[in-house]
Amino acid sequence: MNDIFAIPFKRALQINLKDAFTVVINNTFYQTAASVEADLTQLDKYRDVLFHLDVCQADLNMLKQYYMALKAIAVKLPDDQVEFTWFNTLGLKSSGMTRNSLRFETFNVLYNIGAMYSSLAVEQRLESTEGLKESCRLFKLSAGCFKFIYEHEVSNNFKFFDEYTLNALVSMMLAQAQQMVWKKACFDDIERHSILSRLALQVALFYQTASKNSNCSPYIRTDWVKSLTSKSHYFMAIAYYRSGLHQVQKQNYAQGICDFQYALTWINKLSLDDELTEWRGEVQALLESAERDNDLIYLQASVQNPSKVKPVMMVQADLFDEIEKKDGNIFKNLLPIDVLESCNAFNERVETYVKEHISNPLESMNKLLISNTPQYMDFKSYYISEQEWNSYSDSLQDLEQLRAYVAGELKLSESILQKDIQENEQMIREHGLLRWKIPSKDKKIESLLADLTNIRNYIENGMKVDTETASLFKTLDHDLVTNVSQPPESSDPIMKEASLILQGRKNHILAAERKIIENRLLPKIVSYYKKTGSKDFEPVFQEHIRMFDGDLLQVQKEKAKNKEMLTKVTLSSPEQVQISRNDPRTLYLEELKHSSNVLSELKENIISGKQFYQDLITALESKLKEIEDYVNERKLQRTELNDTLLCDTNES
């Protein structure tokens, strides 16, 4: 029962970490990966230790370096950009897990640091006091690693690790740390039965918790579960064996007898080797001796319950010094992701500021001026894009192709019926009309031919509509509806002035938007962060938006100009309204409106035309199947009748 557990290292799948992070940095940052190439190379070297781990202080230090480097880059990169795969090694079969997460990689490296501490603890000289103390320290650090992962996984809903497995590992490491304390106490004074009992009971309780959680874990092997259970029973037996010695030492023989009996119940649950068999004999002998002394000398009344031993916990999970630290030297030149996110947030604030204080007011003024200027004409709603124009042309060609397909299917259907009629006529010529009883055109054939004639009429009508639609499209002026030919200037002086004001405001909005693009906040925020280390970028934002002070002043001027213009429009004479009726822009708009109406009619014709041909295709496919089935039936009838007539001829 003196054997102790070392947690096996998890295994990782090899990846080229440098290449993976290079892609992420180049795609995510305004910086290039070349600026941190040396750091990426170093990170790759750190990760190499995962694939040739030895139980030694040097490899532990390498694991810690990699762990701290990961924590350094984790605050500067998105978490979900690189895929990592790790394999559990606690069971007889290895099972893998793959996640796109830097945190997943970081916690698995921390897991291996915990495993390394446990392996180093096992390798200490446990026959010496110093060896036991060092082993205890290392087991506590191992427990600290697993507990640290557990506490972070609670908030992560255990996406990366199993809850029971982590709990089992923490309890297992604490049990072994407590076991080292108990063993050292045995070395120090084997006769201090009370303290040894209390220390042993806490060891038993730790192992008991580890056993329960291991049993619920999907990863921990069964023989470990059994061993943990046995260890719990073993130290429970030790606790009450020592308690019995303590009670006998105090001449509480009845209580001592009860404790020895209780210790034996735990011993009997164990698989006994030679050493345990010998110890059971020793406990049995002590029990019998105590019973004899009590019966002959002390005559104490028998006790039914074992002593209430109070466990004493001498260990807790400890954290190694670097567990919360980041490597301060690696990736120094790479900006943290939250700084970049702040840049994006402040860029959005700049855009919102320009929209609220410049774009929206100018657009509102334009709308107000247009709504109060009846002569003003807005052509934009009537124009179509070159792509939309081409879509009309392509749709007309689609109609032609659909019509051609339907005509081809109709021709095929007609040819099948005509061939059947001709074959039947040939049989009539061979056997004579009196002997051949199958008509060339029965009612069904006549009905099918009539249906095909109706479909042909539909196709011809569709062709007429298609021709009219195509002719309608040809009447349109491409340059007019696609705004290739710009609208003429108005002859109305108020309209001319209004148009200039409206266009000037549109240009001002575009200029303000260009100013946003050409003067990004990112360089200023980067410079401010490098100078101060502060992530409070509000002063940078306030200084940045001062570039729009001139635009804000222009907005105020435009407000005054809008009032002046609205007054002019209100006071405009009826003659100006008459001018607008003969205005070149008015005539241009009328032609554009007419073209827009034609396009609406075209669109409706194309949509209904496509549906028309789709319906015809469906009807023809159904009719063709009906024709083929009936023609096959008639062929079978002709074959049977022909065979019968030939047989009669031969017999006669």
UniProtKB/Swiss-Prot annotation:
- Output the Pfam families linked to this UniProt entry: ALIX_LYPXL_bnd, BRO1
Task: Give the matching InterPro entries.
Answer: ALIX_V_dom, BRO1_dom, BRO1_sf
What cellular component GO annotations does this protein have? Answer: endosome
Highest taxon listed in the record's lineage: Eukaryota
| UniProt cross-references to Gene3D superfamilies, sorted A to Z | alix/aip1 like domains (1.25.40.280)
**Domain BRO1 stretches:** 3-369
Q: How does it assemble?
A: Interacts with RIM101 by binding to its two YPX[LI] motifs.
Q: Which family does it belong to?
A: Belongs to the palA/RIM20 family.
Give the protein's function.
Required for the proteolytic cleavage of the transcription factor RIM101 in response to alkaline ambient pH. May act as a scaffold protein that recruits the calpain-like protease RIM13 via VPS32 to its substrate RIM101.
Instruction: List the PANTHER family.
Output: PCD6 INTERACTING PROTEIN-RELATED (PTHR23030), PROGRAMMED CELL DEATH 6-INTERACTING PROTEIN (PTHR23030:SF39)
This protein's name: pH-response regulator protein palA/RIM20
